[in-house]
Amino acid sequence: MKLTHNFSFLLLLLLVHMSSKHILASKDSSSYVVYFGAHSHVGEITEDAMDRVKETHYDFLGSFTGSRERATDAIFYSYTKHINGFAAHLDHDLAYEISKHPEVVSVFPNKALKLHTTRSWDFLGLEHNSYVPSSSIWRKARFGEDTIIANLDTGVWPESKSFRDEGLGPIPSRWKGICQNQKDATFHCNRKLIGARYFNKGYAAAVGHLNSSFDSPRDLDGHGSHTLSTAAGDFVPGVSIFGQGNGTAKGGSPRARVAAYKVCWPPVKGNECYDADVLAAFDAAIHDGADVISVSLGGEPTSFFNDSVAIGSFHAAKKRIVVVCSAGNSGPADSTVSNVAPWQITVGASTMDREFASNLVLGNGKHYKGQSLSSTALPHAKFYPIMASVNAKAKNASALDAQLCKLGSLDPIKTKGKILVCLRGQNGRVEKGRAVALGGGIGMVLENTYVTGNDLLADPHVLPATQLTSKDSFAVSRYISQTKKPIAHITPSRTDLGLKPAPVMASFSSKGPSIVAPQILKPDITAPGVSVIAAYTGAVSPTNEQFDPRRLLFNAISGTSMSCPHISGIAGLLKTRYPSWSPAAIRSAIMTTATIMDDIPGPIQNATNMKATPFSFGAGHVQPNLAVNPGLVYDLGIKDYLNFLCSLGYNASQISVFSGNNFTCSSPKISLVNLNYPSITVPNLTSSKVTVSRTVKNVGRPSMYTVKVNNPQGVYVAVKPTSLNFTKVGEQKTFKVILVKSKGNVAKGYVFGELVWSDKKHRVRSPIVVKL
């Protein structure tokens, strides 16, 4: 089915009304993005050329408003460099009329989006006890030297040692960016932090007038400094969090140059970033000369032409810029993954082999290991009464609110001097401890639910606290209910290394299958995203709560926002090592060398001790030292993506405008399963068989590869040919994968397997995902 302009707009309005989050966004704002696709600039983009584009935007909108002056007042962004479009204050009827214009690809509301280390690089094998072996990708890729990594986030704290420029040479001459500090004299860039910009007009269109404190790329949240330093922070020795996790903090490409694009601001109804600002930042980062763009934010899955991150990523890919995105923090439910365009690298989150342990010791002598980064501790070996928080319920509070330890839900008379057991969920984990402390409680135990299982997060609690697995939480609750005077002690936090099993998928990590394009497996890869230590801001506390007076220059945070920049840093290394490789080749190297095994070894598990699937980890857990020498890659170009969009239902005229060139869809249209992706997904094996085509390119020495297949349950897989002989670098070979339902098959739903090409030196693995 083709998506016409009218249908696309009506579909978007339907999605808006289906989502309460988007209802709030559209009620707060009558601002829209009008997207025309790509520019047709020839050669260097001059100021005059950009001014001419801006004038055409005023003329275009003026033709609808009846006044060029009104159009000029309405437009608050003109995208004039690589992305062609504008953001403006429009009413719904006018937006709908504009969407019908043949030159318009899409019109969509200025939607709100969400923001989605000392040990992690050791865990990934780039170093061992601060020693960098010759096999490390760091050595082979010169630590990412002079690659430019841009970060779309909450800005940057420029004073952080992670962004010092000692030992760096001149800024690369190809860099065109600026340090936008005209209204913040305290903000300075250098040879490491080579650029910083801020974009807040879309945010202002949604929330109203902003004061002068918003006119700076300075990070007042901490998220942006953390993600940027994870991707490319310098080596900073002696870093710890309240004495825990001591070591040298560093990013994946520590010798890369970095640029911060501030697009996220104080939350409004839980959302921090807006489409109009995100598009403006992409347009700037592409023009400025970024090699890698890291994007730890996203929204609800939607049509690619109505998705600011997908649009910006496509225009970046046209300029051979690698774009890495977080998968989202809406797990463990299926089909929650965001940022699912095939021209993006989408990253899930998993644990590493370090934990910040804090034990709960009960009066019966039982010990239960939890995790915490509390900055205070109970007196040594002193026990206190322990009780379920629901039994400390305030008179006017609900039992559920008390169970969750919401602010104001606890009776101080019942709480004083006790350790309270609070249920994880709904309100913030640190906020729960705050509620206990305000009630006079001495400590807190945070109970996991069945859904969060073994997923433990070390938080900087404001009182002695620890978080327990669901199994241990049940045992503690049973002790409390069966003991006349239950007592307990919480031990101080400590750092434990070599944890097994690791990695484990984080329960919050969003999962596939993609609801936008189920033929593409998303996420693509997983990386460390739990309790990652990296740079922070000096402006707020480690909990980001106003009641917390503590300040840290480094912090431990969890989320796919943290795993995303790990892959961004690795992409930076590969860009340094192989500057001519396409973004697709870099993604392929990362995916096909990943592992699906933990350090026991056994299959990677989820937070409930079940075997995880590719819908959680994609191709697997990243292995950077193997990614630098993948042997073969699955490559893709812009034409491949455009043909994919044709097959997805977009019409040729839309796609031509989107790409900036006249484009004719291939005839016949390609099968969606035949996009040359490093994974193979057949979302509906209803016919007798499906044949999938793939092409691999040799990026190593001449070699003979043979294939091995692990069949998904109930599916027989044949590969033709079964061997590929490569005689030179750059040589390409095509093979077919035939998938057939097995006779007598009883399997239903999704099943999983793998296809591996090997020459005994390289192992080029692709996951196979089939729905029966």
Curated annotation (Swiss-Prot):
Expressed specifically at sites of lateral root emergence. Residues 120-628 form the Peptidase S8 domain. The active site is at 153 (charge relay system), 223 (charge relay system), 561 (charge relay system). Disulfide bonds: none annotated. It comes from the Eukaryota. One of its GO terms (biological process) is lateral root morphogenesis. GO terms for molecular function: serine-type endopeptidase activity. Keywords: Cell wall, Glycoprotein, Hydrolase, Protease, Secreted, Serine protease, Signal. Residues 398-480 form the PA domain. PROSITE patterns: SUBTILASE, SUBTILASE_SER. The keyword Zinc-finger does not apply. Residues 31-116 form the Inhibitor I9 domain. Belongs to the peptidase S8 family. This is Subtilisin-like protease SBT5.3. It comes from Arabidopsis thaliana (Mouse-ear cress). The lineage of its organism: Eukaryota, Viridiplantae, Streptophyta, Embryophyta, Tracheophyta.
